[in-house]
Amino acid sequence: MAHLRGFAHQHSRVDPEELFTKLDRIGKGSFGEVYKGIDNHTKEVVAIKIIDLEEAEDEIEDIQQEITVLSQCDSPYITRYFGSYLKSTKLWIIMEYLGGGSALDLLKPGPLEETYIATILREILKGLDYLHSERKIHRDIKAANVLLSEQGDVKLADFGVAGQLTDTQIKRNTFVGTPFWMAPEVIKQSAYDFKADIWSLGITAIELAKGEPPNSDLHPMRVLFLIPKNNPPTLEGHHSKPFKEFVEACLNKDPRFRPTAKELLKHKFITRYTKKTSFLTELIDRYKRWKSEGHGEESSSEDSDIDGEAEDGEQGPIWTFPPTIRPSPHSKLHKGTALHSSQKPAEPIKRQPRSQCLSTLVRPVFGELKEKHKQSGGSVGALEELENAFSLAEESCPGISDKLMVHLVERVQRFSHSRNHLTSTR
C-alpha cells in the first residue's frame, strides 16, 4: 500500500458519499470513472472522478500531478478543482462540472464555421496565457482536452502531464503528450518551453477545421518520426487567409519564432472573427440534437467505455481519458505530492537506468552507417527512423536496448559456435 501514502491527507477521514451524491456516469477510462454529482451541502452540480489507486498504480504520479496543478490554478479558463477524498483505495476527485462536452464532441455533427473556431481558440489562448504566466506548460493541448460549460464557457482540462518550468526550459528527455499534436522539439527530446503548447494549439486549430489532426491516417509511431523530419503541416482548403496565417504562425518548427499566447490573442484571426462565448451554445445545441437522433452511440476511443446517455434520458457530455504518452517516473519534472499532505510523497517506482549501449554502441554505429550512406548518395531517412525507435523504446522501457544487445550477442555466439562445430566435424 506504499503507493497510497501520497494521498494520506486527501480528507481520508471523511466519507465522500456523505458529502456528494453520484448521479449519471458520464465517462469511463482504464482506471477510473467520471460521474455527474451533487454537492449535498451547496446543491451545486459537480463532476466526480473516481479512481481505484490499486488498479492505477502506474498512473499514481499522473494523478498526483493533476491534483497539484489544478489546486494551484485560479483562472476562469482552467477547470476548477474543489478537493479530493480517499475512501479505502478509491480516490474521489471533485471538479467543476462542464455540461457542454468537449470541443471534440462539438466536431462530431460536422465541420465548424471559422467564427466558432476562432472563438474556441481565443478562449484556449486565454487559458494558455494564464498557465504560461504561472510558469506551467500543459503539454497535451487538443480538442478532447478542451471542455465547455452549458453556457459556452471554454476551459482547459486534463493536467496529468502538465509541467512546471524551471528557469526557462524543461529539461531534455521529458517525452510527453499525444503524438499527433506533439511539437518537434518534444519528440526530439530537446530542451523546450511553453512554445510547445503553441505548436499543439496550431495542430488543434487544424483539428477544429478538419475534424482530425494532420497525419491521423498514419500509425502514431510513424507520426513521431515524420513530425521532426517533414515540413510543418498547413491548413489546406477553402479557409480565410487570416486563419491560414494563424496556423502557420503556430506551426513554426523553430520554437523561438512561434508567437506567445499573449501575442496570438492580438492576431487578426482572433480579433476579427471571434464572438462572445455564449455564441458557442449553438454548437452545444447542435451536438445534443445530433446525439438525440441516435448518432455517436459507439465510443470513438479504444481506451474509453463512454456512457453517453444519462439514465433519465438527458443528453450529457462525454468525458474521456484519451491516450497520452506520459513521462516515466524517473524523468518527472514536477512530482506532485498530494495536496495538503504533510507526509512523505508516494515512494517512486524504481526504474532501470537507460541502456548504456545507446551511447557506446547504437549511436556510433548509426552515425557510421549514415555517413556511409551520405557518401554513396543514399538516403538516411530509414536509418534515422530506426535510430529514433531505440530512443522511443527506452522511454517506455528503460534498459530494453541493453537486453536486446545481450540477446543478440548470445545468438551470434551460439550461431558462431554451431558453425565452428559443423566445420570441425567435416
From Swiss-Prot:
UniProt-annotated binding residues for ATP: I26, G27, K28, G29, S30, F31, G32, E33, V34, K49
GO annotation, biological process: axonogenesis; establishment of Golgi localization; establishment or maintenance of cell polarity; Golgi localization; Golgi reassembly; intrinsic apoptotic signaling pathway in response to hydrogen peroxide; positive regulation of axonogenesis; positive regulation of stress-activated MAPK cascade
Reactions catalysed, as given in the entry: L-seryl-[protein] + ATP = O-phospho-L-seryl-[protein] + ADP + H(+); L-threonyl-[protein] + ATP = O-phospho-L-threonyl-[protein] + ADP + H(+)
Localization terms from the record: Cytoplasm; Golgi apparatus
Acidic residues: bias regions: 299-314
Tree of life domain: Eukaryota
Modified-residue entries (Phosphothreonine), positions: T174
An example molecular function term from Gene Ontology annotations: protein homodimerization activity
Entries under Pfam families matching the protein: PDCD10_N, Pkinase
Required cofactor names: Mg(2+)
SUPFAM superfamilies registered for this protein in UniProt: Protein kinase-like (PK-like)
Main location group: cytoplasm
Active-site positions on this chain: D140
Description of activity control: Interaction with Golgi matrix protein GOLGA2 leads to autophosphorylation on Thr-174, possibly as a consequence of stabilization of dimer formation. The C-terminal non-catalytic region inhibits the kinase activity.
SMART domains: S_TKc (SM00220)
Chain intervals for the UniProt region annotation (Disordered): 291-354
Keyword set, alphabetical order: ATP-binding, Cytoplasm, Golgi apparatus, Kinase, Magnesium, Metal-binding, Nucleotide-binding, Phosphoprotein, Serine/threonine-protein kinase, Transferase
Enzyme class: transferase
EC number in record: 2.7.11.1
Family, per entry: Belongs to the protein kinase superfamily. STE Ser/Thr protein kinase family. STE20 subfamily.
Subunit and interaction comment: Homodimer. Interacts with CTTNBP2NL. Part of the core of STRIPAK complexes composed of PP2A catalytic and scaffolding subunits, the striatins (PP2A regulatory subunits), the striatin-associated proteins MOB4, STRIP1 and STRIP2, PDCD10 and members of the STE20 kinases, such as STK24 and STK26. Interacts with TAOK3 (via N-terminus); the interaction promotes STK25 abundance at the level of protein expression and/or stability.
Function, in words: Oxidant stress-activated serine/threonine kinase that may play a role in the response to environmental stress. Targets to the Golgi apparatus where it appears to regulate protein transport events, cell adhesion, and polarity complexes important for cell migration. Part of the striatin-interacting phosphatase and kinase (STRIPAK) complexes. STRIPAK complexes have critical roles in protein (de)phosphorylation and are regulators of multiple signaling pathways including Hippo, MAPK, nuclear receptor and cytoskeleton remodeling.
Protein name listed in UniProt: Serine/threonine-protein kinase 25
